[in-house]
Each structure stands twice: as C-alpha cells, then as structure tokens.
Design a protein with these regions (language model features):
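Phosphate-end processing signature that detects enzymes handling 5′-triphosphorylated RNA
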Residues: 1-173
Length: 173
C-alpha cells in the first residue's frame, strides 16, 4: 500500500519499493515472526489506457474480506504514484466486468512481517514451490534496510518487468 500523503499537501501518493526474488521461505518461520500477518489476495487487472495500471483486489485476513481498487503510474524502477480506495463488494463485482481479458487473476498468500522500521511483504504464489517475491516499501529511494538471515535472496528484481504481478497475470495458464 502506498505511503500516506495528505490530500491538502498537493503531492501525489507515492509507493517506493524494492523487490527481491527469494528462496521459498520456511512457513513455520513466517508464522512465528512477532506481528506477522497472513493475507489471501486475489488480484484482477482491469482494462486501462496504457499510461497506468488499474486493478482490484480481494484482500482476506483473519476471516474478513475487504475490496480495494488501485491505480498505479510508474515514475522510476522503484517509485510509482499509487492511488487506492476501498470498495463495497457490489462495486468490486461490477469492476470485475472491466477485467483485462489478456490477464488472469493472480492469487497469492502474502505474509506481512515487521522488520525494524519496515514491513516485509512476502508473496507466495501457488505456481512456485521453490521461490517467492519479497517487497519492502521505503520512505525514499535511498532508504536502507536489513533482511533477516532466514531470508535467502536469489537476486534483486526491482525494475524487472518479468516479476511485476501484471506480467505474471499474462503468463498464468
């Protein structure tokens, strides 16, 4: 989710993040992390004009589902303008009619793990059993962070379009 920006500030809400391909994490380790949260996400991409990416999400945590609409516009490999709003279930279902037919819905389990002043978001996909994607949101592109030793990075994939969820949605069967 994007960094909050006051509507009175005149600034656009920015999402600044780095992304890593990691070895599939130990599920027991994920569950045991203090403050860890497990979220089931179904992400559907909507038709757009090409200047931005539009999607809707079903976000289920602890038996409660919320629906979120997101519009993203790329500024750099690490930074995007991201505008989100919560939807009613009826509005979510109506927007599904605008789904991009060239992309499949992406289902994933997201683990949110507090780590110092950051939150690690680890996405587990049903089509991968040996790797996962880790994202960390930052306050600036220069912001530094440390990953726990239990996280084994294969490589950084920030800016690699193959690891965008919107790209994965095109590759799914």
């Amino acid at each position: 989710m994007s960094n909050p920006v006051s509507p009175l500030s005149g600034q656009e809400p920015l999402e600044i993040e780095r992304k890593f391909l990691i070895e599939y994490p130990d599920p027991v380790w994920l569950e045991r992390q203090p403050g860890s949260r497990r979220v089931e996400i179904i992400q559907t991409y909507l038709l757009s004009d090409g200047s931005s990416t539009r999607r809707v999400r079903s976000w289920t945590e602890a038996g409660r589902t919320v629906y979120i609409r997101t519009c993203k516009r790329r500024l750099s490999d690490r930074t995007r303008v991201e505008v989100e709003d919560e939807l009613s279930e009826a509005d979510y279902l109506a927007l599904l009619k605008e789904a991009d037919p060239t992309r499949h819905p992406v289902e994933k389990t997201r683990w949110c793990i507090p780590c110092g002043s950051h939150v690690l978001e680890i996405d587990l996909y049903p089509f991968w059993s040996d790797q996962a994607v880790l994202e960390v949101e930052l306050q600036s592109e220069e912001d530094e962070f440390l990953l726990p030793p239990e996280i084994r990075v294969i490589r950084e994939v920030t800016g690699d379009p193959r690891y965008l969820n919107s790209s994965l949605a095109r590759e799914l069967p």
